[in-house]
């Protein structure tokens, strides 16, 4: 999840102003002078003396909103009736609800959907648990599980504050892929307790999406759940980012005419997303990846307390380079940032190989300002929606879960992730591909179905799909 910005800072100001004292042009001028942009005007009421209007204003941030309101307060004859943040209005009462698929209008309806008729369905599932997939919501339902410890851009804000993010995630599952998802925010940071809770609720779900759980706990939680459950478990902060990154890189390399096996990649931020990005790149065929964290390049001559870094050192940096980001980036074809704002300098970009590719994905502020980097890079991507080539997990998780659910996959394996990345990349045609369009829009209607199909094929190919014809049971007339 990215921090709010842009259109998310729209506010609606209800103003009452006296016609004989002030004109609307005075109001518009004050808003513009304070830095606001009027995007909508609605007349609520009008009389000989007063006019009441709702003015929707776009602002950069909350400070600018305050400046706009203060400017309006200073205008004689203007009264501020109310100020509404449109983003907050969308969240009142939560963003999702449960709907019934079958109307219950008669006693007969009631007896079939609940007692006594439901007992026959329960018995059928007890006799053959596979029928849970055909007779309950399990086959199309995903749990979005978080403890609120690593909400991107906000950090450890806890389970209550994480709920709006998880509700939003559930909405996107439904809107983009028709998957019913439910947010589950846990009031515990204990790794073992989280594992046991998720295992206990798993019978109701066809998949588990782990979200915004801090590293290194997220690695152990996902690993254990994948081992102990027979449904897909997917930590989106790791693998969703990795899949979309690879999709973008595949297309970027076409533009610069380079191959995965020949490139040098420097990656900053060896946390959950950084490690997952590295692993998918290695699986795709990249041979030379150098991971850099705050202490410099990860190399084999160092003993790290973090066991994941120790493993990382064995898998990467074939030349065992040492030093800072600035030291190791010389000659790099690709920079990938999942770290912190402003750590990549223009001087670093100048040291890179010809036609450098930069994925600066820190949110809300990338590792380098795209406008500063633009003269020196061939392809630039960020995690932001206000620049071209946004690396957005929404391109991945709806389609990858849609495919996994449709074939009843036991897991989402590396081959399925690779297939998803290639499918996303394929949505951008050869005619469309250019430096500012290496990745499709999240609203491209082809994405989910293309990913779904590729994931299903990979699941069958690797033997993790279990879709078969399960008899529903009950009287069939035969």
From Swiss-Prot:
Its cofactor is Mg(2+); Mn(2+). The activity is enhanced 5-7 times by ammonium and potassium. Its EC number is 1.1.1.38. Belongs to the malic enzymes family. Pfam families: malic, Malic_M. It is an enzyme of class 1 (oxidoreductase). The keyword Zinc-finger does not apply. A divalent metal cation binds at residues 211-212, 237. The lineage of its organism: Bacteria, Bacillati, Bacillota, Bacilli, Bacillales. In addition to the NAD-dependent oxidative decarboxylation of L-malate, the enzyme catalyzes the decarboxylation of oxaloacetate. Residues 12-86 form the ACT domain. CDD domains: NAD_bind_2_malic_enz. The keyword Iron-sulfur does not apply. PANTHER family: NADP-DEPENDENT MALIC ENZYME. The active site is at residues 114, 169. It comes from Geobacillus stearothermophilus (Bacillus stearothermophilus). Disulfide bonds: none annotated. It catalyses: (S)-malate + NAD(+) = pyruvate + CO2 + NADH; oxaloacetate + H(+) = pyruvate + CO2. This is NAD-dependent malic enzyme.
């Amino acid at each position: 999840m990215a921090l709010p910005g842009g259109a998310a800072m729209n506010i609606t100001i209800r103003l009452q102003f006296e016609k004989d004292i002030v004109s609307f042009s005075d109001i518009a001028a004050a808003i513009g002078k304070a830095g606001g942009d009027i995007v909508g005007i609605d007349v609520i009421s009008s009389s000989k003396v007063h006019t009441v209007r709702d003015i929707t204003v776009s602002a950069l941030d909350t400070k600018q909103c305050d400046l706009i309101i203060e400017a309006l307060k200073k205008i004689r004859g203007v009264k501020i009736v109310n100020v509404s943040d449109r983003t907050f209005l969308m969240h009142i009462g939560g963003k999702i609800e449960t709907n019934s698929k079958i109307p219950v209008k008669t006693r007969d309806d009631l007896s079939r959907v609940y007692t006594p008729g439901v007992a026959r369905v329960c018995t059928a599932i007890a006799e053959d648990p596979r029928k849970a997939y055909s007779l309950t919501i399990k086959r199309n339902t995903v749990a979005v599980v978080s403890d609120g410890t690593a909400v991107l851009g906000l950090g450890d804000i806890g389970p209550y504050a994480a709920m709006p993010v998880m509700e939003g995630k559930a909405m996107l599952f439904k809107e983009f892929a028709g998957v019913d998802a439910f947010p589950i925010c846990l009031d515990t940071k204990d790794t073992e307790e989280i594992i046991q809770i998720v295992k206990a609720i798993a019978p109701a779900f066809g998949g588990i999406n782990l979200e915004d759980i801090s590293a290194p706990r997220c690695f152990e939680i996902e690993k254990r759940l994948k081992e102990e459950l027979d449904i897909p478990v997917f930590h989106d902060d790791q693998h969703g980012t990795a899949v979309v990154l690879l999709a973008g890189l595949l297309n970027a390399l076409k533009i610069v005419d380079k191959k995965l096996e020949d490139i040098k990649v420097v990656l900053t931020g060896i946390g959950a997303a950084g490690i997952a990005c590295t692993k998918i790149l290695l699986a795709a065929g990249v041979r030379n990846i150098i991971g850099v964290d705050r202490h410099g390049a990860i190399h084999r001559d160092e003993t790290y307390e973090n066991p994941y870094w120790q493993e990382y050192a064995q898998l990467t940096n074939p030349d065992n380079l040492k030093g800072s980001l600035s030291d190791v980036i010389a000659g790099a074809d690709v920079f990938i940032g999942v770290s912190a704002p402003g750590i990549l300098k223009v001087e670093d970009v100048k040291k890179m190989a010809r036609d450098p590719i930069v994925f600066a994905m820190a949110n809300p502020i990338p590792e380098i300002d795209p406008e500063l980097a633009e003269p020196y890079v061939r392809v630039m991507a960020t995690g932001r929606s206000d620049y071209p080539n946004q690396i957005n997990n929404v391109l991945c998780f709806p389609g990858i879960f849609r495919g996994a659910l449709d074939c009843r996959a036991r897991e989402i394996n590396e081959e399925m992730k690779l297939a998803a990345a290639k499918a996303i990349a394929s949505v951008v045609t050869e005619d469309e591909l250019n430096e500012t369009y290496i990745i499709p829009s999240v609203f491209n209607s082809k994405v989910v179905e293309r990913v779904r199909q590729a994931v299903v094929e990979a699941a069958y190919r690797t033997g993790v799909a279990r879709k078969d014809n399960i008899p529903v049971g009950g009287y069939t007339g035969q």
